[in-house]
Amino acid sequence: HSREPGPADDVPMPRPRRRETPEGLLVNRLAGKVVSAPGSALREAFRVAGRFAGDPIGTTTDAVKFAMSLRRVLAPPDTPHSPALTGGGSGYRLDTFDVAFDDLKASGRAAGGSVNDAFLAALLGGVRRYHEKLSITVDFIPVAIPVSLRTDADPMGANKFAGARFVAPVGEPDPKTRIVAIHDLIADARLEPALGFLDLIAPVVSRLPGIVLSRLAGEMTGLSDLQASNLGAIGRPLYLAGARVTRVYPMGPRPGIPAMVAMLTYEGTCCIAVNFDPEAIADAAAFSSCLRAGFEEVTALAHGG
């Protein structure tokens, strides 16, 4: 207290308390639980996450490693959002285009990567071109993708995926270098013990109030500028009311982010669908055109480009 109405000059003002986000609270809570959990619970956690299956967890060291991995998995990407992919609303715009599967596969192989690596490299190349068209220089953007957790021990046909966030090299002009960088980023992500943590916490999270779940989901999904997903392939012809289906475009959800790009391969064609926010992406026509150019840039590698 004071005898004067104004603050005393020689008394420092108290520092404001740091506001915890729902995601931050969840990280701290889970990290503490993992460190203090008994060995049997940790074994189950690692089993569900697809890591260290069958190995005994007998020391605190492994628990601490899991907790540290959990912090890395949930930490916001260490790069700012792109100024060209800002804002956001409830509207959406859909765009579709096709790419030859053999070309995309050969392009990935030319750089020592996969079809998925080439797909992501093409998207980043398109986003880079969009920034250049707007005279904006951006080296990295936060990107989210699903990562396969399948191992040789999993049964044939089993699918195991977990969401991962990356600081993606959108400013890299060389498509081969982008493919290599993406391949390495995904390989590193697969080594995180806590990557499949959502399977571990699902029984607990499902009991949270709806408003908490909504805020938590918004915080976790809204950290990226771009989300992409390669949904694999349909291995047989499809028919609708007797008519043969010629294309299948996967319209992926856009969970509070500027753009969601999904790819599904059908009869030798990569069917690509873009769901983007017209309020976050001001020049929709340019964005679509640049994405197509990004794929042309990458698929040129298949022909010695």
Question: For the regions a protein language model found, what residue spans apply to each?
Answer:
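Soluble acyl-CoA-dependent acyltransferase catalytic core bearing the H(X)4D motif
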Residues: 1-257, 261-292, 296-305
